[in-house]
UniProtKB/Swiss-Prot annotation:
Keywords: DNA damage, DNA repair, Endonuclease, Hydrolase, Metal-binding, Nuclease, Zinc. One of its GO terms (molecular function) is DNA binding. The lineage of its organism: Viruses, Varidnaviria, Bamfordvirae, Nucleocytoviricota, Megaviricetes. Binds 3 Zn(2+) ions. The keyword Lipid biosynthesis does not apply. It comes from Acanthamoeba polyphaga mimivirus. Its EC number is 3.1.21.2. This is Putative endonuclease 4. PANTHER family: APURINIC-APYRIMIDINIC ENDONUCLEASE (PTHR21445:SF0), ENDONUCLEASE IV ENDODEOXYRIBONUCLEASE IV (PTHR21445).
Length: 312
């Protein structure tokens, strides 16, 4: 009898997860296990968290029992989530170096945590690496190291865990910010590895890199190229952000939706694409813009309702 209930619950989850969900990155400083309830209370149906301090390469690992309970809370509140890996992970360092090995340990720790959380976790998002000058590497060598890092982390973690590669903003020495670079990484993996690697499209980042997504035409062009070179079915989620800086600025500064340089026409087109392909939208917006109608800083509820109206 218990088995039938579990199968039924799983079937319902599969059906419900095949629709576009809306949410945002949330802070877990007020409690880790209570984070799903908090996310639900503010209106999220999907959310993102760091498991530890984002600027620390090796935060203390979460306890097994709290990770399992966290997963139960996701089921209770009908939520999907994704873990964002430490900002300091850099797989472009030479394999065997202390910084490379520490990056692997950090990523493996988070992947193992998602295994305990369960199948309502989309995986672990990591940034593109940086080809820092002290390593004296070519860009291709740095990308080769990045591929080695992915392969290494996958080989040390359960087969049901997933790495999600986030598009970069071309800041500084960041590699593979363009679709060609992402494809170079992806197609260096074998079939089994590719099954465990997905992508997160950050709208602010691709705008900063030089993809003009301010119009439906530009949005269609970007996703058409991505589909041709990688496949849109490999997009796990979209970091849905406007940008405070101009096209091809190579500067990563998120803006609230419709209060930045990308604007409503492009953002609406992205929401429409997400709905068509059932891709989840996760906002990382600063919520610092002033609503001219209220003369107050905008709230997540305002952004949520805005995006929800675009998905109708």
């Amino acid at each position: 009898m218990q088995s039938n209930i579990n199968i039924c619950t799983l079937s319902i989850f599969i059906i419900e997860s095949m629709t576009t969900r809306i949410g945002r990155h949330i802070n877990i400083s007020k409690g880790f296990v209570s984070a799903p309830e908090y996310a639900k209370n503010i209106g999220c149906s999907v959310f993102q968290i760091f498991l530890g301090a984002p600027q620390q390469i090796l935060s203390k690992a979460r306890q097994k029992d709290e990770l399992i309970e966290f997963g139960k809370q996701l089921i209770k509140h009908d939520l999907i989530m994704v873990v964002h890996g430490s900002y300091t992970i850099n797989l472009c360092h030479p394999p065997g170096s202390k910084k490379f090995e520490t990056s692997i340990k950090s990523l493996v720790k988070d992947l193992n945590a998602t295994n305990l959380i369960g199948d309502r976790c989309l995986g672990v998002i990591i940034h593109m690496g940086k080809n820092i000058s002290e390593n004296k590497l070519t860009v291709d060598q740095a990308i080769d190291n990045y591929v080695t890092g992915i392969k290494t982390a996958l080989s040390q973690t359960p087969d049901n865990t997933t790495i999600v590669l986030e598009t970069g903003a071309s800041q500084g020495s960041e590699v593979a910010s363009h679709i060609d670079g992402l494809a170079q990484i992806y197609w260096c993996l074998n079939d089994a590895e590719r099954e465990r690697v997905y992508f997160c499209i950050d709208t602010c980042h691709i705008w900063a890199t030089g993809y003009d997504i301010s119009s439906p035409t530009g949005v269609k062009k970007f996703f058409k190229e991505f589909d041709k070179k990688i496949g849109v079915e490999k997009i796990s989620c979209i970091h849905f952000n406007d940008s405070k800086t101009g096209l091809e600025s190579k500067v990563d500064r998120h803006a609230d939706l419709c209060y930045g340089e990308i604007g409503s026409n492009g953002l609406k087109a992205i929401a429409k694409f997400a709905k068509e392909y059932k891709i989840h939208l996760i906002m990382e917006t600063p919520l610092d813009a002033i609503n001219p109608e209220t003369n107050q800083e905008i709230s997540y509820n305002e952004e949520y309702n805005k995006v929800k109206s675009w998905l109708k």
